[in-house]
Amino acid sequence: MSASDSIRPVDMEELRAAIVSSVERDAHLRIHGMNSKRGWSRAWCALAQCLSKNLHALDMSGFDGIDLYEPEELILRAGAATRMSEIQKHLQENQQALSFEPPDFAPLYGGTAGGGTLGGVIACNLSGSRRVRAGAARDCVLGIEAVSGRGELFRSGGRVMKNVTGYDLPKLLTGSHGTLAAMTQITMKVLPASETSASVFLSNLKPDIAVVVMTQALSSAYEVSAAAYLPASVATQVMPATTNTLTVLRLEGAEKSLPARVELLRKHLMEHGDSELLQDDESRALWSFIGDARFFASGDRREDLLWRLFLPPSQSHNIDAFVRQLGEAYYFLDWGGGLAWLGISNETKEKRAVCEKVAAFALEQGGYGVLVRAPDELCGVFGGFSALGALENALMERVRAAFDPDGVFSPVQV
């Protein structure tokens, strides 16, 4: 896609005109802000493959900037193309944070850390390791302003969580991957940031035992905010001194109360062996590595086919044996076992056949998989929610027909 194929509206009227014009010309638009997640969704890959002659980039970078931030009211409103780094900076200055811990996946696609936007995070419903305790990005969206595929401006939600005005469109658009409407402005709920954090970890646990430990810790009274399992091949990248697996549990909170909770948790874990402790700075560095999937953004792993598998935690340990069958492949678990990151060497032969095995494995475990980094021809097949049944697919088609009947933003179902 050349620069001449890009459309960059700077206000609402220009955006509406661009969409209406595309409908009239039977053209298609690929929405992006900083282009930091190019190839993330099935919709983009299908557009790139099939419609290159009539495809234009809809550059939303003109809709940026924080126009409302009231720390005392715990709300922030910003343009969809506002960089997450700018938002994080303002929140940190006021000891606040987005509770769902938005990850930074730009380096996974060769980009610079901090290059993502608020619109990209919300469009993809990207949630970090704290999701298991604080909820997803979707749960923190208060309001959205957007233009549909019909060229119609609409606003939904407001400045409070309670919604009595009708359909909760902000939650619907969150995770829609830019296939229903072009978001221009987003209002978010923010919360006070934790004063400090610490991580307790156990070494050399087998995957099935690790999942049990994580499940028990997350359901305990110690307020564990994140839980992950790192096989030895992954653990050594962030802690070079180790040659064992790591099962990591994070606690956050007030400086006065956190040490007591940490000690209680460590006593609770004694039956599984001696635990070790990472203090605040080391703990934050470790969880950035985990939440941003940095293992797959550096070295030989940068070219891996990359999957996110959403699995029932009770079944997620089965991925260990499955990965051994694949050959050169790597994984780790986040969300207490609910999310598995799986990277498969780009040198693997019969890539499509391997991807079919991965998708089938996820279904067998009662979950589903999404291919988030691969050649377009593979993402176009495996980058969507293939586990949906006929009823769910029909419902999604009805929603898409209401917002974007001409398929301006996506000719295929995500």
What are these regions (language model features)?
Residues 1-38, 43, 50, 273, ...:
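N-terminal accessory segments
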Residues 123, 142-298:
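C-terminal substrate-binding/cap subdomain adjacent to the FAD-binding core in PCMH-type
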Residues 2-29, 52, 59-112, 122, ...:
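N-terminal glycine-rich flavin-associated loop
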Residues 85-86, 207-212, 256-263, 315-321, ...:
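Short, conserved charged micro-motifs
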Residues 33, 81, 249, 342:
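Residue-level signal for inorganic ion chemistry
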Residues 46, 53, 108-109, 273-414:
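Conserved glycine-rich FAD pyrophosphate-binding loop
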